[in-house]
């Protein structure tokens, strides 16, 4: 029996659905994840540690991009507070419009191990298939953090690897692992 209640999941499809409180929680979550060693570093961020000043404009950009057909945010809450989140998106171009990508998968460090990321990923898969009409999802994960095993358990397959593509710190290069899930 799980001692922790399951997270409540909610899907956001438009910028106006993100309240000021949720915006602050998204920023706090991402800052905490990155500064605890999490592998969710946006291209716009400096190397860790990051601050709210670094994170806020990236969150704002993700929120502005929310659109029912192109980009959705899934949030997980526990006890009414944000516990984790991710983004599912697709490209409009006809060559790739049948597939989407999952990005920014994260849970608050203090709430890890409670099935929050699993619940988010399972819901993302259903949303992508049933609501967005996608046929395949892609994700890129940092090697050396055990993430590829997490995704494998959820049915994802490694389809490529860029050796040493991610420099986490001087002398600490990690592979970027490309994974795919057929829906």
Where are these regions (language model features)?
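Short, low-complexity, intrinsically disordered N-terminal peptides in bacterial proteins
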Residues: 1-9
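Conserved beta-strand-loop-alpha-helix junction that forms the acyl-donor binding cleft
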Residues: 112, 137-148, 165-170
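Short hydrophobic/aromatic beta-strand or adjacent loop that forms the aromatic wall/cage
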Residues: 71, 174-178
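Acetyl-CoA-dependent GNAT
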Residues: 10-13, 17-98, 103-104, 108, ...
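Conserved GNAT acetyl-CoA-binding A-motif
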Residues: 121, 128-141
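Conserved acetyl-CoA-binding loop of GNAT-fold acetyltransferases
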Residues: 152-162
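Glycine-rich acyl-CoA binding loop
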Residues: 113-121
